Amino acid sequence: MAQVEYRGTGRRKNSVARVRLVPGEGNITVNGRDVRSYLPFESLILDINQAFDVTETKGNYDVLVNVQGGGFTGQAQAIRHGISRALLEADPEYRGSLKRAGLLTRDPRMKERKKPGLKKARRSPQFSKR
């Protein structure tokens, strides 16, 4: 018999995370590596587990993640978004608690583009009076 698996795609900044939830002991694997060796900060790991804390399902699922693009923070938040969507697929009754926690909303903030005549998006060249 085929194993039950729930999928979710999460995005944040330039990161895209494809998440698979499989019933298990709570192991999280990111790009073939354990989450603790992949992400350098404990705060990012807590960020990822937030969806499980809200739905009280910590330790019920193994998480398999393939994530690309962006930096550590963007990737961690993309994973969190993907886990939230996969949990919603697993049990639609989680929608209320996940929505209240703001975990189903895609954060729209992106890097502002560089403008011509400026050094960065808003940083202007140094002004010289003389």
UniProtKB/Swiss-Prot annotation:
Metal-binding: present as a keyword of the record? no
The UniProt entry's GO CC annotations, sorted and at most eight, read: cytosolic small ribosomal subunit
One Gene Ontology term of the biological-process aspect is: translation
Question: What domain of life does the UniProt record list for this protein's source?
Answer: Bacteria
Pfam families (alphabetical): Ribosomal_S9
Alphabetized, the UniProt keywords read: Ribonucleoprotein, Ribosomal protein
Q: What are the recorded GO MF terms, alphabetically?
A: RNA binding; structural constituent of ribosome
The record's annotation in Gene3D superfamilies points to:
3.30.230.10
Return the PROSITE patterns for the record: RIBOSOMAL_S9 (PS00360)
Stretch list, region Disordered: 98-130
N-terminal signal peptide: none
- Designated name of the protein: Small ribosomal subunit protein uS9
